[in-house]
Amino acid sequence: MASISSTVATVSRAAPAQANMVAPFTGLKSNVAFPATKKANDFSTLPSNGGRVQCMKVWPPLGKKRYETLSYLPNLTEAQLAKEVDYLLRNKWVPCLEFELEHGFVYRENARSPGYYDGRYWTMWKLPMFGCTDSAQVMKELQECKKEYPQAWIRIIGFDNVRQVQCISFIASKPEGF
C-alpha cells in the first residue's frame, strides 16, 4: 500500500493594526434623555448633633490603660453586666470567664506578629458554660471568681461554637486602683 503525504503551506502574516479589530463602544446615550434637577446645597435636612456637643466628653487618655471592648466606659454595674451577658446568650454564644493575675491590659509577650492584637493568655475559670441560658448563672460564677481571686482582672467572653470564634470579650472586674 502506498502512502501519500501532502503538505499544505500556510502563510501567517501579522496584522498591522490588531488593536483596531474591536470597534469602540458607541452605545451610550446622551444626557438629554435623563432629566436632572439641580438642587441647592441645603444642609438643614442632614442629621446633626451640634446642639449636644457640649455634653459629650471623652475618656481621659492620660494614666488610663485600655483593656477590652467597652474599656472606654466607666465600670459596668451588675445590671449592665447582666444585660451584656443576656446579649451574648441571645446570639447563642457560649459564655466563659477568664482571669489574669498580673497584666490585665494589652501588651505583647508571646506573639510579636501583627495578625493578633495581643500576645496574652488568660486563665480560664472552670469550663465554658455550654448550655447556659440565664445571665444569673454567669453572674454567680463571676462572684465566685472574684471571691477566689480578688486582685484579678476578670473578663467575660462569648464564644460561637459553630464558627469556632470568640465574638465578644469585655472586662467584668478589675483590681482596686485600676
From Swiss-Prot:
It comes from Flaveria pringlei. SMART domains: RuBisCO_small (SM00961). It comes from the Eukaryota. The basic functional RuBisCO is composed of a large chain homodimer in a 'head-to-tail' conformation. In form I RuBisCO this homodimer is arranged in a barrel-like tetramer with the small subunits forming a tetrameric 'cap' on each end of the 'barrel'. PANTHER family: RIBULOSE BISPHOSPHATE CARBOXYLASE SMALL CHAIN 1, CHLOROPLASTIC, RIBULOSE BISPHOSPHATE CARBOXYLASE SMALL SUBUNIT 1A, CHLOROPLASTIC-RELATED. The keyword Plastid applies. One of its GO terms (cellular component) is chloroplast. RuBisCO catalyzes two reactions: the carboxylation of D-ribulose 1,5-bisphosphate, the primary event in carbon dioxide fixation, as well as the oxidative fragmentation of the pentose substrate. Both reactions occur simultaneously and in competition at the same active site. Although the small subunit is not catalytic it is essential for maximal activity. This is Ribulose bisphosphate carboxylase small subunit, chloroplastic 2. Belongs to the RuBisCO small chain family. GO terms for molecular function: ribulose-bisphosphate carboxylase activity. One of its GO terms (biological process) is reductive pentose-phosphate cycle. The keyword Chloroplast applies. Its main location: plastid. Residues 1-54 form a transit peptide. It is found in: Plastid, Chloroplast. InterPro entries: RuBisCO_ssu (IPR024681), RuBisCO_ssu_dom (IPR000894), RuBisCO_ssu_N (IPR024680), RuBisCO_ssu_sf (IPR036385). Keywords: Calvin cycle, Carbon dioxide fixation, Chloroplast, Photorespiration, Photosynthesis, Plastid, Transit peptide. Pfam families: RbcS (PF12338), RuBisCO_small (PF00101). Coiled coil: none annotated. Heterohexadecamer of 8 large and 8 small subunits.
